[in-house]
């Protein structure tokens, strides 16, 4: 049996990407953003097609993502942040709630969101991961933007066939 398959597409030319970056743990978040923007450029996304907004912390990321999603101007969004474990339960709360909020926005607005909000035990782990995770976020955003656009086209083929059948019936 032969099955259809979609090959990953990392061509960023023409894609519009919105990035929301937390300022808490700023050196790590700046490292994430630098790596992400550099990778977007390498993938062909034009600088004028990228909007970067910053928010105070990880819990504010979902609301900013929601506003960007509501605008309808972006093919994909990226969440950048760093939640580093401290001595209280706050780490779990921030990690869980920001992650759930990001997922909800993606599903509610049918827009891909690359989640690169790091959750680490200490600063060293965050610094060690920031560059590669920033790059990963760019690749995920571009690939998922292209995938969702390709999947959106699946329904268009059926509509085109129905229109062709309707046109033939009208001519008969």
Swiss-Prot record:
The active site is at 90 (proton donor). It comes from the Bacteria. Gene3D superfamilies: Lumazine/riboflavin synthase. It is an enzyme of class 2 (transferase). Residues 150-172 are annotated as: Disordered. InterPro entries: LS, LS/RS, LS/RS_sf. One of its GO terms (cellular component) is riboflavin synthase complex. Pfam families: DMRL_synthase. Pathway: Cofactor biosynthesis; riboflavin biosynthesis; riboflavin from 2-hydroxy-3-oxobutyl phosphate and 5-amino-6-(D-ribitylamino)uracil: step 1/2. 5-amino-6-(D-ribitylamino)uracil binds at residues 24, 58-60, 82-84, 115. (2S)-2-hydroxy-3-oxobutyl phosphate binds at residues 87-88, 129. It catalyses: (2S)-2-hydroxy-3-oxobutyl phosphate + 5-amino-6-(D-ribitylamino)uracil = 6,7-dimethyl-8-(1-D-ribityl)lumazine + phosphate + 2 H2O + H(+). GO terms for molecular function: 6,7-dimethyl-8-ribityllumazine synthase activity. Its EC number is 2.5.1.78. Belongs to the DMRL synthase family. Catalyzes the formation of 6,7-dimethyl-8-ribityllumazine by condensation of 5-amino-6-(D-ribitylamino)uracil with 3,4-dihydroxy-2-butanone 4-phosphate. This is the penultimate step in the biosynthesis of riboflavin. This is 6,7-dimethyl-8-ribityllumazine synthase.
